[in-house]
């Protein structure tokens, strides 16, 4: 296999106008890979460390230190290694960093190189990235979980829940699912305008109308689904990313004007699941409330997907504990939460072996990089969360999945309703 000849990084901008790292890897056979690193707005305290420069430049958010770490230490360490040994390369960078959370070199530096190496190796092998990573069994196209109303830390809409998503579970193909989702998105704009609300957009391309409650937002989406000619629960299901750690303060959940315990929040979710065709609830409780997650999973986990995002942070060790405690039943997969592809692979594999579902995910700060689209297929996630069908940083991932579907031809299978085995709607 071709060896790594040169590793290089630069500072670029993400979709929110903040700096991020872009890494390039060149192999001795002329092959090449480039990758841009995403960044989150609502971040879990257990995530790998994103290295920022501080100071006045870019309001302290520059990444020149991370870029320097790639161009000097990481590049020197990886020169001469075979590019197809992803685990060896990732472990070399982890060892070089020497910290538990990649804080010395920066997870943003390490991840950029990790992804660029995989792309260069795929280029050298003459394979698309999803096939290079996933092998011949990589053939399942994921359900697009489209965030069409943005709230919480992603918008100024006033609603506490961070994301209201649609899942086109009734489609036969990914391309049909994408069309269905886009049609609902446009119908929602019409519904919002008819009610005299703002059609401004949040970080992830979803609308950010000023609504008073979770139910009001869900009602808007149900109306849009029907306006577009689809049946809620049959053609299009609903999903939530609550991001509850964002409104957890002093031991209570400050939700919709009241203060609630974990048990009271569980009742809120149970009522929502009974009232709406909800297939998935992400981060319903604070990120260290293990007991609360276990109780919630026992209460409603048989009929809805309970996803750990800030709760698991794509970390195999936290996931292992969650499996042992029967806390949640699904993992959100964000490559920059853990910082290398290898550790991401390990987390997804562990989840699937335990009967957990997995959802590949973007971050609110994205680039035109499409790696996660390939990873969703390569790792057989069955679900992908990458924003509304709007804004090129989000649509780039959907368009890549259209290309993958075309490449797969008759071998491609759309996950559809099967991605949500617990949903009884």
UniProtKB/Swiss-Prot annotation:
Q: Which residues cross the membrane?
A: none
For this protein, the record's Pfam families field holds:
Enolase_C, Enolase_N
**Subcellular location field:** Cytoplasm; Secreted; Cell surface
Query: Which top-rank group of organisms is this from?
Result: Bacteria
Cofactor(s) needed, names only, are: Mg(2+)
SUPFAM superfamilies attached to this UniProt entry:
Enolase C-terminal domain-like (SSF51604), Enolase N-terminal domain-like (SSF54826)
Keywords assigned by UniProt, alphabetized:
Cytoplasm, Glycolysis, Lyase, Magnesium, Metal-binding, Secreted
- Sites binding Mg(2+) sit at 241, 282, 309
EC annotation?
A: 4.2.1.11
Q: Which pathway is it part of?
A: Carbohydrate degradation; glycolysis; pyruvate from D-glyceraldehyde 3-phosphate: step 4/5
Is this entry keyworded Coiled coil? no
Q: Where is the active site?
A: 204, 334
Enzyme superclass (EC): lyase
- Gene Ontology cellular component list: cell surface; extracellular region; phosphopyruvate hydratase complex
Q: Which InterPro entries match?
A: Enolase, Enolase-like_C_sf, Enolase-like_N, Enolase_C, Enolase_CS, Enolase_N
User: PANTHER family this protein is in?
Assistant: ENOLASE
User: Any idea what this protein is called?
Assistant: Enolase
Query: What is the protein's species of origin?
Result: Corynebacterium glutamicum (strain ATCC 13032 / DSM 20300 / JCM 1318 / BCRC 11384 / CCUG 27702 / LMG 3730 / NBRC 12168 / NCIMB 10025 / NRRL B-2784 / 534)
């Amino acid at each position: 296999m071709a060896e790594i000849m040169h590793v290089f990084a630069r500072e670029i901008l993400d979709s929110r106008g903040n700096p991020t790292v872009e890494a390039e890897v060149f192999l001795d056979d002329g092959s090449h890979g480039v990758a841009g690193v995403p960044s989150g707005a609502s971040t879990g305290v257990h995530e790998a460390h994103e290295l920022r420069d501080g100071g006045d430049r870019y309001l302290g958010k520059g990444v020149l230190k991370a870029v320097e770490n790639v161009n000097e230490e990481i590049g020197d360490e990886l020169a001469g290694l075979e590019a197809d040994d992803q685990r060896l390369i990732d472990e070399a960078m982890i060892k070089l960093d020497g910290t538990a959370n990649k804080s010395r070199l920066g997870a943003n530096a390490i991840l950029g190189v990790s992804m660029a190496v995989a792309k260069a190796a795929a280029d050298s092998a003459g394979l698309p990235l999803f096939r290079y990573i996933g092998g011949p069994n990589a053939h399942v196209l994921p359900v697009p979980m489209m965030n069409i109303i943005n709230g919480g830390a992603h918008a100024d809409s006033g609603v506490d829940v961070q994301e209201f998503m649609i899942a086109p579970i009734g489609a036969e193909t990914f391309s049909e699912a994408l069309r269905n989702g886009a049609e609902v998105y446009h119908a929602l704009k019409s519904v919002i305008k008819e009610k005299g609300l703002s059609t401004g957009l949040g970080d992830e391309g979803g609308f950010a109308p000023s609504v008073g409650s979770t139910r009001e937002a869900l009602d808007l989406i149900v109306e849009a689904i029907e306006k577009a000619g689809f049946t809620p629960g049959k053609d299009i299901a609903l999903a939530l990313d609550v991001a509850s750690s964002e409104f957890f303060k002093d031991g209570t959940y400050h939700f919709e004007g009241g203060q609630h315990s974990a048990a009271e929040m569980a009742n809120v979710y149970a009522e929502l699941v009974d009232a709406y065709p909800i297939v998935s609830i992400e981060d319903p409780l604070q990120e260290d409330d293990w007991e609360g997650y276990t109780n919630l999973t026992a209460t409603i986990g048989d009929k809805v997907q309970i996803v750990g995002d800030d709760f698991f942070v794509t970390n195999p060790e936290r996931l292992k504990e969650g499996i042992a405690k029967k806390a949640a039943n699904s993992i959100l997969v964000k490559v920059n939460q853990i910082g290398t592809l290898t550790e991401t692979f390990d987390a997804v594999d562990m989840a699937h072996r335990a009967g957990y579902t997995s959802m590949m995910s973007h971050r609110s700060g994205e680039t035109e990089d499409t790696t996660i689209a390939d990873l969703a297929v390569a790792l057989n996630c069955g679900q992908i969360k990458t924003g509304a069908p709007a804004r090129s940083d989000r649509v780039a991932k959907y368009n890549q999945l259209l290309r993958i579907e075309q490449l797969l031809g008759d071998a491609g299978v759309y996950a559809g309703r099967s991605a949500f085995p617990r949903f009884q709607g």
